[in-house]
Swiss-Prot record:
HAMAP family associated with the record: Cytb6_f_cytF (MF_00610)
Keyword Transport: yes
Protein name: Cytochrome f
Short name of any one Pfam family annotated for the protein: Apocytochr_F_C
Gene (name only): petA
C-alpha cells in the first residue's frame, strides 16, 4: 500500500468529499474525514463504530472472508452494502439525488491492504478503481473508503495482505476478528450535534402554528404558546412539512416527514492465520491414514483368500 502521510490522506478525502458536495466539507456525506478528525480510533470500547453517531438509522451490511489464510498471502474481503438502488436521498441543496456509500474495515494488527504488485490480476479486476485510505498513520490496519456512487460500489472487494509471523513477532498463528462498518446515504447529525436536512424536525414547544413561511433555503414555522410567546423553527430545504397553519402541536411533535432513506450497519467475522507447518503435518497425517487404510484392505483380502483356500482344502 502507498505510504501516504496523514495530511495528504486527509486532503485526499476532503477533495473527494468536495466532489460530492455542493457545500464542501460542511456536507454530512463527507463522513470519512469527520470520523478521522474527531476520533483517534473508529471503534469504541463498547464495540460501536463511531460512524453511527452521525448516521442514526440502522441498516444491514455483510462481509465475507476465507475461513483461514496462510501468512504473506493476499485474500479477498468482500463487503456488501445492500439497498434499493432506485431510492433517492435528500442532498444538501434540498434536491433529490442518488445515494453514496462508504465503509470502514478494521483489520487485525499486522493485516493491511495488499500492495498493487501483490494483487493477482483476477482479484484486481474485482477491486476495480477503489481507493483505500488508512484511517491514520497510527492505525494502518484500519481502512476507509468513500463516499462512492452506491449503484456501482454497493459491493466492494478489499485485497488484504496477511502478515507473516516469521518477520513480524507481534503476529501469531491465531483466530482474529475483523470488524466492518458500512453506510449508505447521508447522515442525520453533524459532529457538533446539529441536525442535517436529512432528518426529522420537531416542534421546539407546544403551541399553535400561526404561520408557515417557505423560502429558497429555509422554511420558517412560527408557533404561539399558551403564554402568548412566539417561537420560530427554521427548517432547511429537504424534508416535507406535514403540519398546517392553525394546527395545535405538542412539544417534540414532528413538523416534517423523515426524509432519510439510508442507514449505517455493523458486522464482524473471523479469519484464522494458519501455520503452513500445521497444514503440511495434517496432509502427512492424512496420507499415513490413507496408506494404513489401503494396507488394511489388502491384508483383509489376503486373509479372505487364505480362508477360502482352507475351506476348499
Amino acid at each position: 500500500m502507498r505510504n501516504w502521510s496523514f495530511s495528504k490522506a486527509a486532503l485526499t478525502v476532503s477533495l473527494l468529499a468536495l466532489s460530492w458536495s455542493p457545500f464542501g466539507p460542511a456536507e454530512v456525506q463527507a463522513y470519512p474525514i469527520y470520523a478521522q478528525e474527531n476520533y483517534a480510533y473508529p471503534r469504541e470500547a463498547t464495540g460501536r463504530i463511531v460512524c453511527a453517531n452521525c448516521h442514526l438509522a440502522q441498516k444491514p451490511v455483510d462481509i465475507e472472508v476465507p475461513q483461514a489464510v496462510l501468512p504473506d498471502t493476499v485474500f479477498e474481503a468482500t463487503v456488501k452494502i445492500p439497498y434499493d438502488t432506485e431510492a433517492k436521498q435528500v442532498l444538501g441543496t434540498g434536491k433529490k439525488g442518488p445515494l453514496n456509500v462508504g465503509a470502514v474495515l478494521i483489520l487485525p494488527e499486522g493485516f493491511q491492504i495488499a500492495p498493487t504488485d501483490r494483487i493477482p490480476e483476477e482479484m484486481q479486476t474485482k477491486v476495480g478503481k477503489l481507493y483505500f485510505q488508512q484511517y491514520s498513520p497510527e492505525h494502518p490496519n484500519v481502512i476507509v473508503v468513500g463516499p462512492l456512487p452506491g449503484k456501482k460500489y454497493n459491493e466492494m472487494v478489499f485485497p488484504i495482505l496477511a502478515p507473516n509471523p516469521a518477520t513480524n513477532k507481534d503476529v501469531h498463528f491465531l483466530k482474529y476478528p475483523i470488524y466492518l462498518g458500512g453506510n449508505r446515504g447521508r447522515g442525520q447529525v453533524y459532529p457538533d450535534g446539529s441536525k442535517s436536512n436529512n432528518n426529522i424536525f420537531q416542534a421546539p414547544v407546544a403551541g399553535t402554528i400561526t404561520s408557515i413561511t417557505p423560502g429558497e433555503k429555509l422554511t420558517r414555522v412560527t408557533l404561539k404558546t399558551v403564554a402568548g410567546t412566539e417561537v420560530v423553527e427554521s427548517i432547511p430545504a429537504g424534508p416535507d412539512i406535514i403540519v398546517s397553519v392553525g394546527q395545535t402541536v405538542k412539544a417534540d411533535q414532528p413538523l416534517t416527514n423523515n426524509p432519510n432513506v439510508g442507514g449505517f450497519g455493523q458486522a464482524e467475522t473471523e479469519v484464522v492465520l494458519q501455520n503452513p507447518a500445521r497444514v503440511q503435518g495434517l496432509i502427512i497425517f492424512f496420507a499415513f491414514v490413507l496408506i494404513a487404510q489401503v494396507f488394511l484392505v489388502l491384508k483383509k483380502k489376503q486373509f479372505e483368500k487364505v480362508q477360502l483356500s482352507e475351506m476348499n482344502f
